[in-house]
């Protein structure tokens, strides 16, 4: 007797169609398309996780630059001054200070200016 494997193939199809729920049009109803776009969605998710790191770094730099210019110094000068003064603070923390605790940020700016001789 021939074994057709109906249960397993139905289970596999159900897995992809369930995952593709919410996709537009035929992508959520046709197995072949649902499987292709399910795999594609994994690629998008992988790329997105890498992109997120770039996006956040860009956001932090923008925030630091805006706050630094309010204090009369450029972003690049601030970072260089902090390196010269031996302050080891990352951009995420610096951006958080610029937004939430501006007085503490001003102290870091003063340290950078002092190291640069401004």
Curated annotation (Swiss-Prot):
| InterPro entries to which the protein is assigned, alphabetical | Ribosomal_bL20 (IPR005813), RIBOSOMAL_L20_CS (IPR049946), Ribosomal_protein_bL20_C (IPR035566)
Q: Is this entry keyworded Thylakoid? A: no
Q: Which UniProt keywords apply?
A: Ribonucleoprotein, Ribosomal protein, RNA-binding, rRNA-binding
Entry-linked Pfam families: Ribosomal_L20
Protein origin, superkingdom: Bacteria
Tell me which GO cellular component terms the UniProt record holds.
ribonucleoprotein complex; ribosome
Biological process GO annotation list? ribosomal large subunit assembly; translation
- Which CDD domains does the entry mention? Ribosomal_L20
Cite a single GO MF annotation.
structural constituent of ribosome
Tell me if ATP-binding is a UniProt keyword of this record: no
Q: Which Gene3D superfamilies match?
A: 6.10.160.10, Ribosomal protein L20
User: What does the similarity note say?
Assistant: Belongs to the bacterial ribosomal protein bL20 family.
Q: What does this protein do?
A: Binds directly to 23S ribosomal RNA and is necessary for the in vitro assembly process of the 50S ribosomal subunit. It is not involved in the protein synthesizing functions of that subunit.
Q: NCBIfam families, per this entry?
A: rplT_bact (TIGR01032)
Q: Which PANTHER family match?
A: 39S RIBOSOMAL PROTEIN L20
**UniProt protein name:** Large ribosomal subunit protein bL20
- The species this protein was found in: Kosmotoga olearia (strain ATCC BAA-1733 / DSM 21960 / TBF 19.5.1)
């Amino acid at each position: 007797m021939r074994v057709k494997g109906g249960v397993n193939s139905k289970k596999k199809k159900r897995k992809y169609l369930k995952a593709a729920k919410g996709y537009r049009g035929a992508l959520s109803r046709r197995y072949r398309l649902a499987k292709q776009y399910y795999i594609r969605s994994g690629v998008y998710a992988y790329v997105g996780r890498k992109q997120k790191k770039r996006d956040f770094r860009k956001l932090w730099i923008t925030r630091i630059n805006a706050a630094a210019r309010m204090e009369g110094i450029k972003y690049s000068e601030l970072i260089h001054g902090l390196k010269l003064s031996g302050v080891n603070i990352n951009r995420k923390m610096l951006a958080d200070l610029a937004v939430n605790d501006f007085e503490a940020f001003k102290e870091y700016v003063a340290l950078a200016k002092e190291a640069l001789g401004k």
